[in-house]
């Protein structure tokens, strides 16, 4: 009798460990990735709005030069670990933090449509095949007198978001191990 109760207890303990691992690996993993993605998108959107209201707006109202705004974008590129673009409504890249200023050879985002971004302020993908890997792209309008002059677009590699999610998920695994050891 004593031996079967002990065996059942050990079996229940291992089942609890297995189900705990499965819950962390599936539900918690997805929840953490979604949370990190949403948080990063919100933070980048705040930055994009700030850029649209200051540097980019000044560029379109001729209060500053391309070079000045380019320096600001380059600094923010390093700070945010992201690629920043200023594009016009037809998809022409006016400035990019990862390309030098070259007005003679403009680059256009093929297929860009501002209507695609009407429902959500961010998207995950290759941004109209502009990148080889998936990125989190946040877009904010540059406006003046209620007219859209262009857009600030910030792209962050999904691999950076996945790395951060994995680090947070590792904490869940450590807590699960501690729970099993203490029980």
Segment roles from a protein language model:
Residues 143-145, 153-173:
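Helix-start (N-cap) segments at beta->loop->alpha junctions
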Residues 70, 97-133:
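Extracytoplasmic/periplasmic sensor domains and loops in membrane signaling proteins
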Residues 86, 127, 141-142:
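Hydrophobic beta-strand positions
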């Amino acid at each position: 009798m004593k031996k079967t109760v002990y065996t059942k207890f050990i079996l229940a303990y291992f089942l609890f460990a297995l189900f705990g691992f499965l819950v962390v690996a599936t539900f918690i993993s997805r929840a953490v990735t979604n949370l990190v993605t949403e948080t990063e998108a919100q933070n980048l959107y705040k930055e994009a709005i700030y850029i649209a209201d200051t540097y980019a707006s000044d560029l379109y109202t001729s209060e500053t030069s391309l070079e000045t705004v380019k320096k600001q974008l380059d600094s923010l590129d390093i700070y945010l670990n992201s690629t920043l673009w200023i594009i016009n409504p037809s998809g022409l890249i006016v400035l990019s933090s990862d390309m030098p200023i070259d007005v003679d050879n403009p680059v256009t985002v093929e297929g860009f449509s501002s209507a695609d971004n009407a429902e959500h302020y961010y998207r995950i993908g290759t941004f109209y095949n502009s990148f080889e890997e998936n990125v989190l792209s946040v877009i904010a309008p540059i406006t003046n007198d209620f007219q859209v002059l262009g857009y600030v677009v910030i792209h962050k590699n999904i691999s950076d978001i996945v790395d951060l999610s994995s680090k947070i998920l590792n904490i869940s695994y450590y807590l699960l191990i501690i729970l099993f050891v203490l029980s």
